[in-house]
Amino acid sequence: VSSTIAPLNSLVTYLAIGIVAVIGTAEVLAGTFLVGQLQAFIRYIWQINDPLSQISNLSAQIQAAFAALSRIVELLDEQEEIPEAMPVKHIADVQGNVQFEHVKFGYYEENLMKDLNVNVKSGQMVAIVGPTGAGKTTIINLLLRFYDVKSGSIKIDGVDIRDLPREELRSMFGMVLQDTWLFNGTIKENLMYSKLDASDQEVQEACKVAYVDHFVQTLEAGYDTVINEESSNISQGQKQLLTIARAFLKDPKILILDEATSSVDTRTEVLIQKGMERLMKGRTSFVIAHRLSTIRDADTIIVMKDGDIVELGDHDSLLEKDGFYASLYRSQFEGLDN
C-alpha cells in the first residue's frame, strides 16, 4: 500500500502546486491576486502534504509489523520437538558403536537419504565428504536428533536413539566445529563448560594434549584470562585449539569434527591437525572432511552430492570405482576439473 500511496501523494502535491502556480500567476498579472497570497497557497499545499507523507510512512511501518507478526505466529505454530519415547531407555556404559539401519530421510516431501546402512564400530572413523552445500551436516543433525529419520533407525550400542532422552543422547558427543564458539568469561570457565566439576589439573592436562597449554601460559593471567564477548582477543586457530581441549576434558565416546582449518597459519594448522588426531584416538569419530588427504585412513567414507549419498566405502575402494569421490580426489591433488 505504501508503495502506491507515496508516489501518488507526490504526484497530487506537485500537480496541485503547478495548477495553483499557473492560475495564481495569471491572477497576479490581472491584479486580482497578491504575490503573498500565492506564496501562502503554495505553503498550505506543502503543509497538507506533510501529514499525508507521515500516513504513508506509518502505513509502511504497519505493513512491516504485520509481516514480522506473521513470521512470529508461524514460528509459534511450529511443532515442538517430538516428545520423548516412554518409557525411555538408558545406556549405562557407552561404548560408541553406531548403526545406521535402512535410514531414509528427507526435508518435507523430498527424499535425500534413501537406504543408508552403515555399521560403525567403537573407535572407528567415518568421514563425510562432498562439495559445499551437499548436505554433509544432515547426518550430524540426525545423530543428534535435531531431526528424526522417516524410516529405519539409528542405534548407539544397540539402542535406538529415539528411545534415549535427548539430553543423555547429546551428552555422549563431543564436538569441534570450524565455527568455534567461546563465551565471555575466562579461558578456564570456557573449558569447564564441558565438565563443570573439572579440577585445575584436569583443565591443564586437557590443554597440554591439545597443544594449547603453552599459549595459555604465555598470557599474563594464564587460565584466568578473560575472553571478550566477540572472542576477538584470541586468534581463530587458538579458538579451535581451545575447543579441542574442551572436548578432551569432556572425554566423550563419540566425536563430531569439522576438520577445516581456514584462516589459520601453517604452524597452528599443524597443531590443530595433531590435536584432532590425538582426540580421535580410541573414539568413534564422524568427520566432516574438506581436504581428502586427511581422511585416507577413514574406516568408512560417506560421499554426498546434492543432499544425497552417492557413494559409500573406504578410500581405496572408492578410488577403484572411479566415481564422484575419485573425481573430487583428482580435483584436489591433480588439479583436474571434476
Give names to the regions the model predicted.
Residues I42, N49, F66, R170, ...:
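Conserved catalytic core of two-component sensor histidine kinases
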Residues V1-I42:
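A hydrophobic transmembrane-helix motif
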Residues T13-V20, A64, G96, S199, ...:
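Residue-level signal for transmembrane alpha-helical positions in Major Facilitator Superfamily
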Residues Q47-L75:
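Cytosolic ends of transmembrane helices, especially the final helix of ABC transmembrane type-1 domains
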Residues V20-G24, P51, A68, V212:
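Hydrophobic/aromatic residues in alpha-helical transmembrane segments
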Residues T4-P7, L34-Q37, Y44, P51-Q54, ...:
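DHp/HisKA histidine-phosphotransfer helix
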